[in-house]
Each structure stands twice: as C-alpha cells, then as structure tokens.
Design a protein with these regions (language model features):
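Basic, Lys/Arg-rich DNA-contacting stretches centered on the C-terminal catalytic core
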Residues: 16-24, 136-140, 180-183
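N-terminal helical hairpins
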Residues: 28-58, 71-76, 92-93
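Conserved tyrosine-mediated DNA breakage-rejoining catalytic core shared by Y-recombinases
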Residues: 7, 12-14, 175-183
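Conserved beta-strand positions that form and line the central face of beta-propeller blades
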Residues: 3, 28-30, 102-105, 172-175
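Short amphipathic alpha-helical interaction/hinge segments
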Residues: 49-52, 122, 126, 163-170
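DNA breakage-rejoining catalytic core of tyrosine-based enzymes
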Residues: 27, 104, 167-170, 179-183
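Short, Arg/Lys-rich segments that mark the N-terminal edge of DNA/RNA- and chromatin-recognition modules
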Residues: 1-30
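Short, Lys/Arg-enriched alpha-helical recognition elements, typified by the DNA-recognition helix
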Residues: 57-163, 175-177
C-alpha cells in the first residue's frame, strides 16, 4: 500500500498506483512533519482501496483550458465569435493570474482571491496575453462585474470537465458566482 520514510528533516510517503493506461507506477510526496505524512498515507491508502485515487498530474490551468476549449467549442458548435471571446478571456484574464498553477493544487479560496484580484484589474491590462503599459486615466477603468461573472462561468464549466477527466475530485470554483452590479 503506502509507506513512510524519513529523509533528512522531512518525511516521504511512498506508494504504488496504476496510471490512466493501467501501467504500474510509483509515487512519493514529501512532508515537513511525520503527522502530515501519516495523514497523507492514510488518505492515499483509502483512495487506492475505494478507487478514488487521483493520479498525480502536473497539468496547469492554462494547459487544461487550452485542451478544453476546442472540445467544448466543437461539442456545442460555438460560433467563431464565442470561440474568439473565450480564447481572449483565457489569454488575458485567466492565464496571467492563475494559468501556471497546477489544476490539482487549486482550491476554492484561490479562485475567490483571483476574482478579488480581477475586480481591481484595469480593463486592457493584458492584450493577447501580453501586459500593457496603461496611462493613469486607463488604470481607472476596472474590469466590470459582468466580465468577472463570465470568467466564473467559463471556469465553472471547464473545471466540471476536469472532474469528468479525473484530474480533480471536485471543482474549485465557488458555488456562488460573483454578483453582477446593475448600477
């Protein structure tokens, strides 16, 4: 099943699992304390027994979204405009902030912090994924609550596919969408 080894000042949990193709693999995770390692060992053993173990994956949010968009667009027959807007949203509003994060490491709190950051982000901060130099006047115009709500809708759908693809157990997107200001 799983075992704990002391390695210098840290503890490693070692375990065997099968990847998506059924090939046997070895995994290990390192923790600062023995208590953390024991907790993870118990979790890994339970997940291996009941078949809910997630194969460790280094896929980033950016990689996942760029795999998801073509599938989603062909499945739901998106118009070229919808496709272009979705890619632009990923490029300019998501990737610069959480794109390099691993999908498996993202938590609801991280997404909520991301929404808070977006609410303080000037419009046009990124164009084609490249940060722009904005004038003081341009910096006054922040992203609208509607734009942040659209980001939430895209992420909620994308992360539900990540659950279906066995990348994560549950979606990190908050249950409640950011409110749209009607002022």
């Amino acid at each position: 099943m799983a075992s704990i080894m002391k390695r210098g000042n840290t503890y490693s949990v070692r375990y065997n699992y099968k990847d998506h193709a059924g090939k046997p693999c070895k995994g290990w995770e390192t923790f600062k304390t023995k208590a953390e390692a024991q907790e993870r060992k118990i979790t890994v053993e339970k997940e291996l027994l009941d078949g809910t173990f997630l194969v460790p994956d280094t896929m980033t949010v950016e990689e996942m979204l760029y795999k998801w968009i073509p599938i989603q667009s062909s499945k739901h027959k998106w118009s070229p405009k919808t496709y272009t807007q979705s890619v632009a949203m990923v490029q300019n509003l998501i990737v610069p902030y959480i794109g390099k994060r691993k999908v498996q490491d993202l938590r609801t709190y991280d997404i909520e912090q991301f929404y808070a950051t977006l609410s303080q982000t000037p419009c046009g901060q990124y164009v084609h994924g490249v940060k722009q130099e904005l004038t003081e006047n341009q910096k006054k115009w922040l992203l609208s609550s509607t734009s942040i709500h659209e980001v939430h809708t895209l992420l909620k759908t994308a992360f539900s596919y990540a659950v279906d693809w066995d990348l994560i157990h549950k979606s990190p997107t908050p249950r409640e969408a950011p409110k749209i200001n009607t002022e």
